[in-house]
Amino acid sequence: MYDGVNVDYTINMTTASWMSASEASRLLGVTRATLYAYVSRGFVRSQAASGSTRERMYSREDVERLRQRTEERRAPDKAAARALHWGMPILESSIALIDGSRLYYRGLDAAALARSRSLEEVAALIWTGRFEALRAPAPVGRVAQPAPDIPFAARAQSLLAVVAAHDPLAFDLRSASLAVTGLRILRLMTRAAIGADPGDRTADAALARAWRVGTRGADVVRAALVLCADHELNVSAFTARCVASSGSHPYAVVIAGLAALEGPKHGGASIRAESMLASMRHARPLRQAVSARLRRGEPIDGFGHPLYREGDPRARLLLDLLGERYGTSAEFRFVREFVRAAADVTGEHPNVDFGLAAAARVLKLPAGSPFTLFAIGRTVGWIGHAIEQYATGQLIRPRARYVGVAPGA
């Protein structure tokens, strides 16, 4: 249940998600006594088997994760390979912590920040470690606005490239200068979205004004931006750190981050979720429509996340806010019904991609706005990762294991 919204639904505990004690013990290569010890220490979840008062079932996800960790300790080379796919941490960062069911920015709950702080305030926290007013950048000279008929990512990338070419301080990588450049980039991203200079307005205020969503909608827009500010070492953050490690300026970091974010396996998933909601708007009954979509080989976009067992807290807050402010609207009722149907069929919770698409649907935002919100918010994290990477002075240069034809073969 999403507090205050009554978006309650039942998650199916399918047999595919749970296993018997004998199967779990076999996969882990341990005795049942050791398995029970893992349960008591919180490493493996268990629940009573259906129709039995004594037999218990064990979480397949937990068992697989525990087995992977054991194998990684025994074979470090395999651990290095797996680190590139939801594996063990490979870089240190003090920006974001994903802890089970919560997301933190520098030790502060991101959901709480999303209800009370602007994106610029969170940017100051992430970039400097403190809530302090960032020094305003010098005005950008006359720069032509990119054509409005190209996608937002392309508009932002072209605008950043042109401004970078004329910014004499683009390569000033001192910490104090980076925060100023970061704020300039954040304003340029907002400008690319609304087609005009936001001036001194915060990103959420500028977007809310351009999109005409009123006070209720402005709160949702602000929260969406803050919730997207960072999410640890995802593909775009890693891309940003790699680019920064070469010594490239922050404009290049964000241009590269946008390229990574746009992919359908990353931030582009929000666009897919937006399209899915549009196509399902009048489908009834929704549960059967969701099942039919799966039968056609089409995914239920915006559901499930490997790092959150009990659901993505970013989506939870966005749905809560929508329910608090638009609970009686037809679009929110549709979103709520869709969440119930999709969760019942798939056993998955909505993630941030769905949350952004739901916000766009309920607020009647322009097409593509879920990705726009994601990208502007995540700009803060990319710059934060760049600042951390610049400070290390290290070039990120992993090695590849050659598996091709042997020389002379």
Description of each model-found segment:
Residues 14-23, 27-409:
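Hydrophobic alpha-helical bundle cores within soluble ligand-binding/oligomerization subdomains
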Residues 1-15:
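Short, intrinsically disordered or compositionally biased N-terminal tails of bacterial proteins
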